């Protein structure tokens, strides 16, 4: 489900955070992003193509620099709640609490703006493990702390796709657990190009699912917790399209691992800046994600209509 995108985090570290963002098959039967035999897990910084009833919390830590080159430690705690309106249409609300601490003792703390979203699962092809969704996220300017949040709003219409490699021939069986997902959408602000330039948000993930390997290719008898792991590399990026930064791309490469069960998932990823404009330090993300459609199928996990 929609990841809370950290590109709208504190202005002091905007350059780096611009982009940032062995069970049985029945155990995953109600997971939210399922097409054919493929389960796309909820990734941390690149939104997956599914919709569902779920709740996500995430902790992030990274060291970056302000405009004067001073080092700043940035800690974030974010949440996102997704609610199905119908089986193919979901609404979301998200925000994050940000704490910036500079070596000279200066600090800024508070909530970032609230982000509202809507997402529609538009197409699935089970035979080819492909699914696509469209959505709109709106960061509502001025709803967060003045020291942290942007005073302007940002609208992000986006497309989300996922493709599993399960349709490869049997001779390439050990490649079938691979999958890719991607998202693409402009970030359109209500500010001037100097204060809040527009940008193009884009990202991809490469995944290798051990549960898929065990269930659909060959049961190797791998023990817990390895049998429930999905290894992933995410690449959340943002390319400035206006103002003085026009043409500049920032982002991170995030290698990590997700551990899934029927009711949710846990994950950890590193954040490695792709260039100097993105930062000089490696960060870390921790994530806990609950599937309300499995935990509370008759209440919180049930579509409204």
Predicted regions and their residues:
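Bacterial N-terminal signal peptides that target proteins for export
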Residues: 2-15
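Compositionally biased, intrinsically disordered low-complexity segments enriched
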Residues: 8-10, 27, 34
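Transmembrane beta-barrel domains of Gram-negative outer membranes and organellar outer membranes
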Residues: 29-305
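N-terminal signal peptide c-region/cleavage motif recognized by signal peptidases
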Residues: 21-28
């Amino acid at each position: 489900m929609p990841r809370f995108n950290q590109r709208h985090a504190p202005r002091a570290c905007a350059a780096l955070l611009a982009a940032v963002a062995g069970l049985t098959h029945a155990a995953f039967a109600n997971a939210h992003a399922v097409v054919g035999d493929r389960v796309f897990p909820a990734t941390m910084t690149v939104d997956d193509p599914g919709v569902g009833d779920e709740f996500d919390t995430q902790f992030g830590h990274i060291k970056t620099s302000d405009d004067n080159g001073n080092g700043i430690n940035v800690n974030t705690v974010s949440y996102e709640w997704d609610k199905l309106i119908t089986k193919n249409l979901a609404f979301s609300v998200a925000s994050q609490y940000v704490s910036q601490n500079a070596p000279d003792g200066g600090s800024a703390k508070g909530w970032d703006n609230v982000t509202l979203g809507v997402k529609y699962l538009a197409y699935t092809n089970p035979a080819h493990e492909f699914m696509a969704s469209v959505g709109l996220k709106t960061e509502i300017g001025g709803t967060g702390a003045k020291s942290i949040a942007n005073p302007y709003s940002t609208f992000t219409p986006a497309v989300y796709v996922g493709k599993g490699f399960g349709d490869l021939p049997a001779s390439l069986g050990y490649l079938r657990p691979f999958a890719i997902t991607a998202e693409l959408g402009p970030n359109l602000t209500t500010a001037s190009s100097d204060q809040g330039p527009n940008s193009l948000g884009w990202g991809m993930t490469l995944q290798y699912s051990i549960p898929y390997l065990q269930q659909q290719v060959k049961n190797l008898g791998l023990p817990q917790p390895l049998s429930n792991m999905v290894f992933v590399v995410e690449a959340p990026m943002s390319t400035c399209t206006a103002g003085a930064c026009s043409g500049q791309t920032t982002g991170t490469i995030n290698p990590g691992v997700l551990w899934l069960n029927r009711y949710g998932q846990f994950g950890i990823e590193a954040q490695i800046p792709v260039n100097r404009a993105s930062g000089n330090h490696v960060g870390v993300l921790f994530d806990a994600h609950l599937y309300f459609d499995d935990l509370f199928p008759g209440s919180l996990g049930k579509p409204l209509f």
